[in-house]
């Protein structure tokens, strides 16, 4: 899980979602998991 000030989609499988007021990226590739923090 990468925590960065700006989250971006890395590949076409990445999905940007909001969970509990946090913007997150979930993907089939676990290395692409990101959270805005």
From Swiss-Prot:
- Looking at the UniProt record for this protein, which Gene Ontology cellular component terms does it annotate, in alphabetical order? cytoplasm; ribonucleoprotein complex; ribosome
Any GO BP: translation
Q: Which Pfam families does this UniProt record tie to the protein? A: Ribosomal_L36 (PF00444)
Molecular function (GO) terms for this protein are: structural constituent of ribosome
| Keywords for the protein's UniProt record, in alphabetical order | Ribonucleoprotein, Ribosomal protein
Q: Which InterPro entries match?
A: Ribosomal_bL36, Ribosomal_bL36_sp
Under the heading SUPFAM superfamilies, the entry gives:
Ribosomal protein L36
Residue intervals passing through the bilayer: none
Question: Is Ribonucleoprotein among this UniProt entry's keywords?
Answer: yes
Task: Give the highest taxon in the source lineage.
Answer: Bacteria
NCBIfam families the UniProt entry points to? rpmJ_bact
What family is it from? Belongs to the bacterial ribosomal protein bL36 family.
- Please name the HAMAP family in this protein's record: Ribosomal_bL36 (MF_00251)
This chain belongs to which protein, by name? Large ribosomal subunit protein bL36
Q: Which organism is it from?
A: Bifidobacterium adolescentis (strain ATCC 15703 / DSM 20083 / NCTC 11814 / E194a)
């Amino acid at each position: 899980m990468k925590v960065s000030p700006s989250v971006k989609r890395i590949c076409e499988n990445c999905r940007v979602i909001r969970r509990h007021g946090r913007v997150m990226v979930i993907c089939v590739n676990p290395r692409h998991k990101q959270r805005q923090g």
